[in-house]
């Protein structure tokens, strides 16, 4: 046989190299004595994932136990992560690499707001002291009525860059309980003043408050819409949850406003960033990956945001639930198998499935509501979640729920 006859072509060489890498991965597992030993060696797991052999060594449903500390609560936990999917990911630099997708088996020990109720007014220039009113544009719930106007009197000016907040829970709270809070900027927690609201049209009209559409920034007094003012914003890329999950900062330091109408989440001062609870050994094997999430079709155009998140909430699509739009990620085999279905699970109580129940890491017999990142596309303020009863539902971004976050070893 001649020299040239013994040379592998490129395809044969690639096959051989893949085979050698797979054999080496298997040998390392054998050498590690036990799978339990391997699943605590994060760097070795990462080497296997990078070699493209994770699905040969691991099974969907295998668990990796990771120490996590609730820094603010001074409480240590072991957080089991289920292997839910094998699939390529895109990194910030645009490269595509193999990934092993993990999701927390239990949910977090406390709640976080997806989004606080947003400000209804942003001061492009100083708003002088005086009486002002706004007019609602749609009947909503028992208390918000189309054409009704509500007035309030500022005793102090609102500086340029400041906000007016208020009308929180307007469809469900009696108008007699409504308040307006003036703030110096979109980061402040304590108001300049708290003002009573009464029905009336005295003073200067700030404008007609739209129901669910985009803010018209060309107006002299641009008003947020009723939905986001009452119950928050359902856009994952702007959410408090996205910031909390991806921060190692201390309590009070993990959130920044994403737009002029954003408001600090209620948990900002009381909880440290989620990533602060992990050791560097685990954080070194996960990194930000591209996450696609559809925007709503009322205040936005329904297109997709692309964020790069180390930790993220699952989408409807990823937990094998019925979707409103495809493109928020491949379904995870873990959920298809757990649900025992060959088609995606439907929504609401009539489609409950006990496999969806997620229990608290600090109360492992107590099922909890857990957040998803998918927006309910027909509203500006509703996001999807998995109800504690085991069914997929949607509700206001304002409410604080727990989560079972995901990440990718890559």
Where are these regions (language model features)?
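Collagenous Gly-X-Y triple-helix signature in extracellular proteins
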Residues: 25-410
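Short, low-complexity N-terminal tether/leader segments at secretion or assembly junctions of large
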Residues: 1-25
């Amino acid at each position: 046989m001649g020299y040239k006859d013994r040379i592998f072509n490129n395809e044969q060489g690639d096959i051989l190299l893949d085979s050698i890498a797979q054999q080496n991965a298997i040998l390392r597992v054998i050498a590690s004595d036990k799978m339990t030993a391997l699943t605590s060696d994060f760097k070795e797991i990462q080497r296997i994932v990078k070699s493209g052999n994770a699905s040969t060594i691991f099974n969907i449903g295998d668990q990796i136990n990771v120490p996590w500390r609730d820094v603010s609560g001074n409480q240590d936990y072991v957080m089991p992560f289920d292997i839910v999917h094998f699939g390529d990911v895109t990194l910030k630099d645009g490269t595509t690499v193999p990934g092993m997708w993990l999701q927390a088996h239990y949910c977090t020990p406390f709640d976080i707001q997806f989004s606080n109720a947003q400000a209804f007014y942003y001061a492009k220039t100083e708003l002088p002291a005086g009486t002002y009113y706004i007019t609602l544009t749609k009947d909503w719930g028992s208390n918000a009525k189309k054409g009704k106007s509500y007035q309030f009197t500022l005793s102090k000016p609102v500086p340029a860059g400041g906000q007016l907040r208020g009308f929180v829970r307007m469809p469900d709270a009696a108008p007699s309980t409504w308040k307006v809070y003036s703030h110096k900027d979109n980061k402040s927690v304590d108001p300049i003043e708290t003002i009573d609201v009464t029905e009336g049209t005295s003073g200067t009209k700030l404008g007609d408050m739209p129901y669910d559409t985009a803010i018209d920034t060309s107006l002299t007094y641009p008003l947020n819409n009723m939905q986001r003012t009452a119950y928050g914003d359902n856009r994952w890329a702007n959410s408090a949850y996205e910031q909390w999950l991806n921060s190692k900062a201390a309590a009070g330091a993990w959130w920044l406003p994403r737009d002029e109408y954003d408001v600090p989440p209620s948990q900002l001062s009381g909880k440290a960033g989620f990533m602060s609870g992990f050791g560097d050994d685990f954080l070194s094997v996960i990194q930000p990956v591209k996450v696609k999430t559809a925007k709503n079709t009322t205040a936005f155009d329904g297109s997709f945001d692309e964020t790069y998140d180390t930790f993220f909430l699952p989408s409807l699509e990823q937990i094998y639930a019925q979707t409103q739009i495809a493109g928020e990620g491949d379904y995870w085999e873990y959920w298809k198998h757990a649900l025992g279905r060959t088609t995606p699970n439907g929504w609401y109580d009539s489609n409950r499935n006990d496999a969806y129940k997620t229990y608290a890491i600090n109360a492992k017999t107590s099922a909890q509501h857990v957040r998803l990142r998918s927006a309910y596309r027909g509203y500006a303020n509703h996001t999807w979640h998995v109800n504690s009863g085991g069914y997929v539902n949607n509700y206001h971004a304002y409410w604080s729920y727990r989560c079972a976050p995901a990440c990718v070893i890559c």
